[in-house]
Amino acid sequence: MRILVSNDDGYNAPGLEALVEALSGLGELTVVAPETNHSGASNSLTLNRPLTVRTAANGFIYVNGTPSDCVHVALTGLMDARPDLVVSGINNGANMGDDTLYSGTVAAASEGYLFGIPSIAFSLIEKGWQHIESAARAARQVVERQIAQPLAAPVLLNVNIPNRRYEDMKGYAVTRLGKRHPSEPVVRTTTPYGDTVYWVGPVGLAADATPGTDFHATAQGQVSVTPLRLDLTQHSQLDDVRNWAEPLCVNA
């Protein structure tokens, strides 16, 4: 079993170290992670400059690029053999609902998924690392289950873990994505040089946390497991759009 491990918080993040330690013994681990924090990088690839690859003292490989860069470089340039599984995390904070569109953690797993490799993203739902060992233990359980009984391809799982002791978790729930309210307004400030700059505001609160969602499950103390796909087509709207577009004419 060959497992590629990445994240978006950077190669020296506690969540990555905890995940690697938790997965030790399950197979041959290769760690390729960003040099610095790339939270919110989504699926971006670096196309305007070359990427450098270095190895840290602990053996982790780090790239001066995005999470997607890391997995892409690992799969197409660094690894001698194709991995059986790609895992990402453990993220410092939730990746639920709309977060998945922006998340570098989910993006690293998505890159593996695009290559046809089963991929799993792990996140601890609150900032800080108070119960990172518990989150790592839950992550190992999910990986062990995938190894023991692999899901039919394609596989892209988004796992969000409550920030509590492992003994206080209320099991696992398979969920759909919830939805957040829009982010808070940008924060405008002035630099010491008199320039006006803007910081993106905090994420919005949950707008859809009804039963069956990732928000609801984690609020109940459950580990949320959400199967994702990358097909963004609104299939239910195809017929409506065909009818709407019928009068359009290139030569009109």
UniProtKB/Swiss-Prot annotation:
GO MF annotation, one: nucleotide binding
Cofactor(s) recorded in Swiss-Prot or TrEMBL: a divalent metal cation
Catalytic activity: a ribonucleoside 5'-phosphate + H2O = a ribonucleoside + phosphate
SUPFAM superfamilies found in the cross-reference section: SurE-like
Top-level EC class as recorded in UniProt: hydrolase
GO CC terms: cytoplasm
Domain of life: Bacteria
Keyword annotations: Cytoplasm, Hydrolase, Metal-binding, Nucleotide-binding
Entry's cofactor comment: Binds 1 divalent metal cation per subunit.
Described function: Nucleotidase that shows phosphatase activity on nucleoside 5'-monophosphates.
Record family assignment: Belongs to the SurE nucleotidase family.
Protein name: 5'-nucleotidase SurE
